[in-house]
Amino acid sequence: MTSCQFSSVEASGSGTVKTLMSDLPKDPRYQFTYRVAEFLNDALYDRYQHDDGTLFRRLMSYHETLSESEEISFVPFCGNHVEILNVDIPEPCVVNYGEEFMNESFYEIDGEKAVAAEAIQIFESFLDLFPLEIADGRGFIESDFRYMKDRRIPVIMGSEYKELFETGDIFEGYYLFERVSFEVIGIAKSGNTFYHPAVGPALYDRYIIMPFERVTNDSPFSRLQLLQETCGFIISENGWETAVSQIQQSLTDSGLADWRDQIVVNTRTIR
């Protein structure tokens, strides 16, 4: 399964900072926006990871079918953390910040100091729904979303990182169990808000913002990444039933009918 979850939280925050629903941008689409998450059981997940590539191709077909729907708009999102190596990051950016088990986010990987850092993975459509202003550097461009093996992953750093990183800086870490290099292309302005399915409204400030890179060739990494992309948001002006129907029909049409009860649409909108 992916790390995507639902939460009934209406507000979230750390320290004295509290982010409320009212801090989200004023977008009428929010009243039609539902959260989507993947809950593959162990048997289906194991089959997906270890088959001959048939399920990977079917899942690609599902995404293509869903993107062509005229009834809904699907906005992929996931919140997998990044394991940063040999860098002391700001405390608010650490996974489990403010919790009694925050110390579990610090460890070693093959003898190197590592820390679990908050991160999100998105497409352009997410930034259309939850805009992000850039203080320094640039935002994402189309080529940032193309998967290129062994290239540095372009990232935008939340404003908490502004004293630590500059545009052009490179750092090492692990993402989806692979060691990768990250290149800072921008630093975000402070105070921009988005909706995190697992925690509710949140500030971009403490997150590493990563592009979902569009995968086409089957590989262990591609399978994990494509599965992450089943999570996110559905905008359905015709209501929850239409959102569910579109997902289930797309799964059936793509040969994934046995996943129909594993991709879940929350009954509540985010607004």
Language model feature labels by segment:
Residues 9-123:
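Membrane-proximal extracellular/periplasmic loop immediately following the first transmembrane helix
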Residues 24, 58-71, 123-130, 157, ...:
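Hydrophobic, Leu/Ile/Phe/Ala-enriched alpha-helical segments that form helix-helix packing faces
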Residues 37-40, 157-160, 237:
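Structural motif
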Residues 111-208:
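Hydrophobic secondary-structure segments that place a key small or acidic residue at a functional site
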Residues 85-108, 203-222, 265:
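Charged, glycine/proline-rich intrinsically disordered loops and linkers
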Residues 174-264:
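Small-residue transmembrane helix packing/gating motifs
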Residues 1-5:
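N-terminal signal-anchor/signal peptide hydrophobic helix marking the start
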